[in-house]
Each structure stands twice: as structure tokens, then as C-alpha cells.
Amino acid sequence: MPSFLRGILKPKERHHENKNHSQMSSDSLTSSYPTSPPKLEKTEAGSIVSSTTQKKTSHHAKPTITTKTEQSQRRPKIIDQVRRVESLGEQVSQKQRHMLESLINKVYTGPLGEELVQTLYLRIWAMKETPESTKILQMREDIRDQYLRMKTERWLRTLIRGKKTKLRDFQKRYEEVHPYLMIERVEQIIMEEAWKLAAHIVQE
């Protein structure tokens, strides 16, 4: 119990005896705390907070704001666009577009598609093992075939797009994704087979 409360509760006859002791205790308590309390500031909501706490909060918030700004200014990589084919735009040339859609239909339904998935499977099986190749080889056959067809379609739509795709356009697109293909060997194999299928469209 603080000394100043003790003095109030004690009988009056002991008041004078404890007066000096109470004063000493009060002085020692006062000396153990800073003489000037932390500055208090009013917030917008009307509550009062310590200026020290406010400074700490603002200090920690700065790196987060900087990081978000850097992320918003980061330009999308070409490989992000390749993964999302719809962001690349479709083929505008009516003739090439018709030939492309016809080819993709054959990949899914005709003997061309059967030959394609067999070729891809054998090339992936013969290549140096990677996490992606292992995943594909362990798939059930029907799932694997569909997976390889979908990846082939993605590369076909990536390679044949724009006003009218020519050989120089393909060369430029290949150079853009070349660093990615050097890391992802499975994607390189699929892209090569897709190009073999689509070469006649570009050469027309």
C-alpha cells in the first residue's frame, strides 16, 4: 500500500510518528521515475497516445510501403505472359487463325494428336530427369496425354499470334523465352514439337 494511503487509514495519534517516514518513502518513489513524463499527443479519433509509441509505429511502417511501391512498379516478365496465353492476344489474320484452330482441333481429336503425345512421351522419357519430367512420367496415361495436348496448345497459341505471324516473329518470340527454356527442358521439348506442327502456317 502506498505511504500516502497508509497515513490516511492509521489512527490520528500515530499520524505524527509516521509523518517523516511517509515523506521519505514518497521522495524515494518520486526519484525512481523520470522527472518529465512522455509527451502525449491527440489522435484523430480523440484518444491520447504516447509520442514515443507513435514514432515506433511509423518507423516500422515505412519498409512495408516501400516494398508495395516496388512491387507495383515491377514490370511483368515475358514468361508470365507465356503462362497466361490469353494475355498475349489471339491471331488476327483470318487465314492463319482458321489454320491454327484447325490444327489445335486435330491435336485433341485426330491421329495427329496421338502421334504427338507418343513423341513427347518418348522424348521426355529419354531426357535427363527433372522434377517436371518425373511428374509427367508418373501420371496415368489418359491424364498425361491430355496434359501434353494442353501444353502443346498453349505453345501453338504463343507462337502463332498477332496480325500475321512470319518467321522473323517466331525468331523474336523464341529469343524472349530462351532463358526460360534452358531451365525448363520439358517446356523446350513441347515448344519444339509445337513449332514443327505450326511451321506450315507461318510459311504460307
UniProtKB/Swiss-Prot annotation:
The keyword Lipid biosynthesis does not apply. InterPro entries: Paramyxo_C. Residues 25-34 have a biased composition (Low complexity). Residues 1-78 are annotated as: Disordered. Pfam families: Paramyxo_C. Residues 10-20 have a biased composition (Basic and acidic residues). Transmembrane segments: none annotated. It comes from the Viruses. One of its GO terms (biological process) is symbiont-mediated suppression of host JAK-STAT cascade via inhibition of STAT1 activity. Keywords: Host-virus interaction, Inhibition of host innate immune response by virus, Inhibition of host interferon signaling pathway by virus, Inhibition of host STAT1 by virus, Inhibition of host STAT2 by virus, Interferon antiviral system evasion, Viral immunoevasion. Belongs to the respirovirus protein C family. This is Protein C. The gene is P/V/C.
